[in-house]
């Protein structure tokens, strides 16, 4: 396995560990999710280039579309929560209240 794949997998798991550690703030969680999606995008792009498989070349673009939708939804949720409650602490929010 080439070194670049090991580095990209390590970057994914570091972002995942950051997501587990910094889950109290919504902004930190969103940044860690973006790091995970970026490492997956680069990994899929390098795999698509090295495999020369035509159908697999669309996979990074589809992943990038999902990452953009996830980022837009996460930022809109962050703006809504910060306007409503004035903070982005996830632990202080109770989603069962109306």
Curated annotation (Swiss-Prot):
Keywords: Electron transport, Membrane, Mitochondrion, Mitochondrion inner membrane, NAD, Respiratory chain, Translocase, Transmembrane, Transmembrane helix, Transport, Ubiquinone. It comes from Echinops telfairi. Its main location: mitochondrion. Its EC number is 7.1.1.2. Core subunit of respiratory chain NADH dehydrogenase (Complex I) which is composed of 45 different subunits. One of its GO terms (biological process) is ATP synthesis coupled electron transport. GO terms for cellular component: mitochondrial inner membrane; respiratory chain complex I. This is NADH-ubiquinone oxidoreductase chain 4L. It catalyses: a ubiquinone + NADH + 5 H(+)(in) = a ubiquinol + NAD(+) + 4 H(+)(out). The gene is MT-ND4L. It is found in: Mitochondrion inner membrane. Core subunit of the mitochondrial membrane respiratory chain NADH dehydrogenase (Complex I) which catalyzes electron transfer from NADH through the respiratory chain, using ubiquinone as an electron acceptor. Part of the enzyme membrane arm which is embedded in the lipid bilayer and involved in proton translocation. Belongs to the complex I subunit 4L family. InterPro entries: NADH_UbQ_OxRdtase_chain4L/K, NUOK/Mnh_C1-like. The lineage of its organism: Eukaryota, Metazoa, Chordata, Craniata, Vertebrata. GO terms for molecular function: NADH dehydrogenase (ubiquinone) activity. It is a multi-pass membrane protein. The keyword Heme does not apply.
């Amino acid at each position: 396995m080439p070194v670049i794949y090991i580095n990209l997998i390590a970057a994914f798991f570091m972002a995942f560990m950051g997501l587990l550690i910094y889950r109290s703030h919504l902004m930190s969680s969103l940044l860690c999710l973006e790091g995970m999606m970026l490492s997956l995008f680069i990994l899929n792009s390098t795999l698509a280039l090295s495999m020369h498989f035509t159908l697999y070349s669309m996979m990074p673009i589809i992943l990038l579309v999902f990452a953009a939708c996830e980022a837009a939804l996460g930022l809109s949720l962050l703006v809504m929560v910060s306007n409503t409650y004035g903070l982005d602490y996830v632990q202080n929010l109770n989603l069962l209240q109306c």
